[in-house]
Amino acid sequence: MRDCVLVRVYGERTELLVDRENEVRNFQLLRAHGCAPRLYCTFQNGLCYEYMQGVALGPEHIREPQLFRLIALEMAKIHTIHTNGNLPKPTLWHKMHRYFTLVKDEINPSLSADVPKVEVLEQELAWLKEHLSQLESPVVFCHNDLLCKNIIYDSTKGHVRFIDYEYAGYNYQAFDIGNHFNEFAGVNEVDYCRYPAREIQLQWLRYYLEAQKGAAATPREVERLYAQVNKFALASHFFWALWALIQNQYSTISFDFLRYAVIRFNQYFKVKPQVLALEMPK
């Protein structure tokens, strides 16, 4: 398999969701920092890149301490990537508003009764922006879509690498981590009982902070990031629920996107009271 290349062809109408020029720039940036495979060429509806040795992980793997430590270290490495220029702005709100507008203008008349009304979604989006913007989570370079199959583990080298940079870009640190924690539940058979328990999260966050700082993390730093991450995990549910509604309308993939959207919205409203009760350490 060492002489293999991968060719990825873009899905139907995915330009509604993904900036393909930005994806290529992200690919090249990550490659320059040793975090991505070689990109050989791009074409109008896809790209060709180096095959990365290893196995794609599943929900049963990413909760193993030896593996989640490697994932935390790799995320910390990516989060330290900087580009020259002005201070970056988070992509979260721009993308979320864009997705919401698509749902509101093009999909709303055909929405299932199981999906919250557009007026409710608009109120929740405004609340998320107001509440989360006050948490002072640093804006860093993020993967933004760290589900299990986007993590490749090479047991011979003892490291993990992340793949698929469609949604990568500058964003809130806590969003990237919270989004990954949500992915412990899986995609095809979603089970939020697998969401990492507090002790697992604290250990994961300790690994991450110590890799980022190059020094021991204080209990306050870990607790602060824990609160930020679980609050931003709410935004992750909302983001991918909107995304799934758009995919349900346009995608030709055999996947029940509407069901997935309903699951993510349901989990959003279920955990919102618990998240609201989390206090930021003084």
What are these regions (language model features)?
Residues 75, 79-86, 107, 132, ...:
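A general structural signal marking secondary-structure boundaries and capping sites
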Residues 247, 251-282:
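Regulatory N- and C-terminal appendages and interdomain linkers associated
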Residues 80-89, 135-138, 214-220, 250-252, ...:
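Surface-exposed helix-capping loop/turn segments at secondary-structure junctions
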Residues 174-216, 234-252, 267:
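Active-site activation/catalytic loop segments of kinase-like enzymes and analogous catalytic loops
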Residues 1-121, 127, 131-138, 156-157:
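ATP-binding pocket architecture of kinase catalytic cores
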Residues 1-7, 125-181, 186-188:
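Active-site acidic catalytic loop and adjacent metal/ATP-binding pocket
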Residues 21, 239-242, 259:
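A broad detector of short, well-ordered amphipathic alpha-helices
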